[in-house]
Amino acid sequence: MSGPPTSAVVESRLVTSTSRVSTGVAQLDAMLGGGLLPGTLTVIYGATGIGKTHLGLTFANHGRTADGAPGLIFDMNGRGDSQQHAEYAERLFNWKLGEWTHTVPPMSEPYPSPEQMAAYYSNAFKWVGRVRDFQVPTPDGSWEFDWNWKATYNQSLYAVRPFLYFHFGAGTRRIVVDGVEPMDSPADSIQFHMFDELYRKTIHRDAETLGMEICLPVWQHREFIDAHRYPHTAITTLLLVTTEETRLEDLLARKVATGDIGATANTIVVLGSERVGSRLARMLCVVKHRGSAMSDEIVEYRVTDRGFTLG
């Protein structure tokens, strides 16, 4: 005889096609027909300094109100120049991000401390450049990832996978991935490769399966795994991609290259600048929003001490 439905099953029933995920910016939600669709991927394109990080932090912080838990900030920046996530979060939202450092090697104690459960920022993937930079030739003339790099990358997953799993199990339903650099051919980008792996194999992996892979031996942690199941179809992802183009017109004319995540994303928003009289204005436009009505307007926005505002 089956027992009562778990909280994850109940929540998944509530995630219907009419559900919406608020960005935290009411005017942008209106342009998106009420908000983002739950469980989907949204890509924000724009040049460095245009306001992508502010928009991402606004989205993540809004999880505190909308979901009962803030979103995660996964920073893929590998250049060493801080994008000031912690500073912005504290100044704009009085939110102390905290950095996740907890790792769970196989058969080790999996559970993070209360302090780590209050940490919503990770910068565990610090590799940038071309995929080929991390590969070596094989005897048959093809290429494969260098074993030393693979070992280091797999080691980083001992931090990344628990970062997502334990926070999703505690109620987080949104994640912002920042720090993705421009690349002539996105298919050659190591950052796009790692994001694709993260998105398919961790963010949208069955919660029970992910828990069984992290919490070993399973028999010892079965009660925790069962009690912390969550519907991965409710996790909404915002990917912030830096572009070489700065003008909105150039971004709107930008072609989707082979391997570009935007080709498979549900929603695309572009942020660019345009000359308005004697000043340079920042403009926003929704380019794609599958499964929903959307505005075709080009709207001015500002990034101020109060954060990201439209109009």
Residue ranges and their predicted role:
Residues 75-183:
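Conserved inter-motif catalytic segment of the P-loop NTP-binding fold
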Residues 183-194, 206:
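Conserved ATPase-coupling elements of RecA-like P-loop NTPase cores
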Residues 190-197, 253-259:
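Charged helix-capping and loop-helix junction motifs
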Residues 211-307:
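Phosphate-binding/switch region of NTP-binding enzymes
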